[in-house]
Amino acid sequence: MAVEMASQSQVLVEEKSSVRILTLNRPKQLNALSFHMISRLLQLFLAFEEDPSVKLVILKGHGRAFCAGGDVAAVVRDINQGNWRLGANYFSSEYMLNYVMATYSKAQVSILNGIVMGGGAGVSVHGRFRIATENTVFAMPETALGLFPDVGASYFLSRLPGFFGEYVGLTGARLDGAEMLACGLATHFVPSTRLTALEADLCRINSNDPTFASTILDAYTQHPRLKQQSAYRRLDVIDRCFSRRTVEEIISALEREATQEADGWISATIQALKKGSPASLKISLRSIREGRLQGVGQCLIREYRMVCHVMKGEISKDFVEGCRAILVDKDKNPKWEPRRLEDMKDSMVEQYFERVEREDDLKLPPRNNLPALGIAKL
């Protein structure tokens, strides 16, 4: 009973005629996704899809975050207690939710008025409409935690213009709302002062046809200018460097750029890469590259294999160490193992992409007569 009450208080539900508004409600934790929240969201999304009276689902966050990611601190506690399979249950449920959202037959509007990181991207970017504001801060910061951009990120990052996805995924770079709109992570940009009116108009929708939501959103959307220092203005440099075959070659290319141009952005990018977990950087790059040629379902199945290896910690224990340094002790000084990129051999990277011994692959549900490896609508 207490579990059910927790999941209901952490995800609030409003019914507005044919529209359902879901609010992530753990503001003190920046709406980090607990296992209860993931289970509740999955239950609600499946129920709304079956209910012919529901035409549109709106998802938003309470407080200054939409969702700052998954509750990885809880997963690390399980790992430290010898229960990595509890963590596997968490990620399998989360990836199932990502897949349901990516293949959803009804329109989903995510209002990203604040922090959107990691798992927060997973419950929004796969949906049809993503609304950024002047308060939006987006990032996939996993390589600094010894993890990798998951929740289907190898699908959506690999589909950004040029090699911008590799840049975002490897460096953990923070994007604002204008940058999200420019690169396609957001579909619309609406000033936060207009969100109440927008929501009221969306709640008048009484049709499954997404063009009704699209027409309303188009009437509210603005096209903000990119800041002068925006990374998106440096897409030519990003493409030259992040198109390289290996992480080592990416860093070398950036260092060559730095000798030709005194640009603080280039040096900050090099520093971000050098601070990340070598194991995480290498598996992240390969994951995004493989994602370009795969459907969203295939990406999630592969990412589940990868995350099981990360949690088992037999190849590298960087996930536990990264969470210790960033989230627990907060000394921001992780001791990565292996310590250097060149010590993370290709044979070690390869192991992350193999099925974990005595562990089943992620089994995705059949969706609307789509193949189980259906393509999402990014």
From Swiss-Prot:
Protein family per UniProt: Belongs to the enoyl-CoA hydratase/isomerase family.
Species classification: Eukaryota, Viridiplantae, Streptophyta, Embryophyta, Tracheophyta
EC number of this enzyme: 3.1.2.-, 3.1.2.4
Residues noted as binding substrate in the record, renumbered to the chain: E94, G119, E142, D150
Pathway(s) the chain acts in: Amino-acid degradation; L-valine degradation
Entry's Gene Ontology cellular component terms: peroxisome; plastid
Keyword Cell membrane appears in the UniProt entry: no
Full protein name: 3-hydroxyisobutyryl-CoA hydrolase 1
Changes seen on gene knockout: Resistant to inhibition of root elongation and promotion of lateral root formation by the auxin precursor indole-3-butyric acid (IBA). Deficiency of benzoic acid-containing glucosinolates in the seeds. Resistance to the pro-herbicide 2,4-dichlorophenoxybutyric acid (2,4-DB).
Domain of life: Eukaryota
Catalysed conversion reaction: 3-hydroxy-2-methylpropanoyl-CoA + H2O = 3-hydroxy-2-methylpropanoate + CoA + H(+)
GO BP annotations listed: response to cold; valine catabolic process
Keywords, comma-separated and alphabetical: Acetylation, Branched-chain amino acid catabolism, Hydrolase, Peroxisome
Activity regulation: Inhibited by copper.
Induction: Down-regulated by sugar.
Gene behind this protein: CHY1
Subcellular location: Peroxisome
pH-dependent activity: Optimum pH is 7-9.
A molecular function (GO) term: 3-hydroxyisobutyryl-CoA hydrolase activity
Tissues expressing the protein: Expressed in roots, leaves, flowers and siliques.
